[in-house]
């Protein structure tokens, strides 16, 4: 017996109307439990400095006459 003949022996019934599947509630977009802070270094990184600090610039000494004063 073919599949169609077996089906015809049963009384014809309209197929049950399947409701469209829905979420029980509208699904919220996924979020972090808390607002995520921007990633940071574990320690705050100090600004990079020269390994040796330059000594403070001293003003050039005032000009002196090259010749020492003549002593008699």
From Swiss-Prot:
Q: Where in the cell is it found?
A: Cytoplasm
Question: Where does it sit, as one GO cellular component term?
Answer: cornified envelope
Q: Which InterPro entries match?
A: SPRR2
Q: Does the keyword Electron transport apply?
A: no
Note down the stretches annotated as region 3 X 9 AA tandem repeats of [PS]-K-C-P-[EQ]-[PS]-C-P-P.
Answer: 21-47
Annotated region (Disordered) at: 53-72
Instruction: Please indicate if the UniProt record lists Cytoplasm as a keyword.
Output: yes
Q: Tell me one GO biological process term.
A: epidermis development
Q: Which domain of life is it from?
A: Eukaryota
UniProt KW keywords: Cytoplasm, Keratinization, Repeat
Per-repeat ranges for sequence: 21-29, 30-38, 39-47
What drives induction of this protein's expression? Answer: During squamous differentiation of epidermal keratinocytes.
- Bias (Pro residues) occurs at 56-72
Q: What does this protein do?
A: Cross-linked envelope protein of keratinocytes. It is a keratinocyte protein that first appears in the cell cytosol, but ultimately becomes cross-linked to membrane proteins by transglutaminase. All that results in the formation of an insoluble envelope beneath the plasma membrane.
Family statement: Belongs to the cornifin (SPRR) family.
Protein name per UniProt:
Small proline-rich protein 2F
**What gene codes for this chain?**
SPRR2F
